[in-house]
Amino acid sequence: MSHTHHTVKHTHVRPAMTPAQSGIHVAIIMDGNGRWANARGRPRTAGHIAGARVVRKIVEAAPDCGIGMLTLYAFSADNWARPSREVALLMRLFRRYLVAETDRCVTNNVRMRIIGRRDRIPSELLRSIKVAEEATRHGTRLDLRIAVDYSSRDALVRAAERLNAQQSVTRDDLSHAMCKVDHWDGECRDVDLLIRTGGEQRLSDFLLWECAYAELYFTDRRWPDFTSADLGAAVKEFHSRERRFGTVPEAAAG
């Protein structure tokens, strides 16, 4: 009586990438709120209120545009120098956004994370941040990162301080250290497309390390007027560009 032995091969199947992992990383400098309000004879605070409403629309539109990670520049470290009344309003608006949008993010499978310093943020806002991050931590459709009290130069300095004791430092070491100081525990990803609204053409100390090879897209449209169609147009132009990452075009190389 013969026995046939079958060898079972075990193959390792890599888990499929989530939409958040496979989509492009878009960063937006949301500029022009104050000028939008001034053009209408209204206080600057009215522009910030109008701009906050746009954030929801852009976040909802992002996954359908093929965006997996969206980083929004909400409040820079330099913005503390603005009038105290304006700063206080921005902090209230941000907390109101977190309270109002956390459940929506859970429903829409969006993970929300706040990057930047946390030692100068009001305690009530800090509590809301922790609640929002914990509630949305399982989101896989979109990684939404909101930069508050953020400075890229400051992040670089603090990351270097963390690595000071190491004998040698690689690019990956620095990237991971910057993620740590910015309270981001996800994948350290470069920016694919940087959008700036409001007509200015500068980076304003935003994601300087991550934007090393980013495509830049500037629009005169002020943030309160920015629409999901504008976002789609920016992404469409991004996909039409040839990204070389320091190399030469294929035609020239051949």
Predicted feature locations:
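Flexible, compositionally biased loop and terminal segments
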Residues: 1-254
